[in-house]
């Protein structure tokens, strides 16, 4: 049995790093929304029912948009699908703190836009892109790394968010999330010729 190098070329390395960054930030940010409830209730007059509806709509849109982003990835490349999804995700978070964000707009921002963004930035599209760049012998390890980094995002993001909410407030925290998402988008944009 011959052993193969884990990372075959520079493209595989860039793809793995980009996918890990995308999953870390997108799943990490998504995991923190429950921590904002008291601030949404006090400042935006969002009830528990409205917040639950937004999260439910978010999950629905995540599921519905996933196959659409998969089709976009097949036709135009995975990087384009993820970049488009990041546009929706960034807009959703941006409008939550600076745009119209009460009533139906809360559902549009947190439910519709963020949910659509998750359809292309969560685990499925980044994992499929990584799978293309690694040989069968190393593919499961590479994809496991992406999953592990996503789990780390689940772990670290709520801790950071709790700290930031106490010290900076919810608006500033969402602003920082927008920056994180924009950094991921910029990283993808800079390496879009390498990632497919």
Regions found by a protein language model. Give the residues of each.
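Conserved small/polar residues in nucleotide/adenosyl-binding loops
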Residues: 186-193
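Glycine-rich segments within core transmembrane alpha-helices of 12-TM secondary carriers
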Residues: 140-158
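Extracytoplasmic
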Residues: 15, 21-38, 46-48
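Intracellular juxtamembrane helix-capping segments at the cytosolic ends
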Residues: 120-134
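C-terminal ends and interior cores of transmembrane alpha-helices
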Residues: 88-101
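Residue-level signature of mid-helix packing/kink "hotspots" within the transmembrane helices
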Residues: 59-67, 155
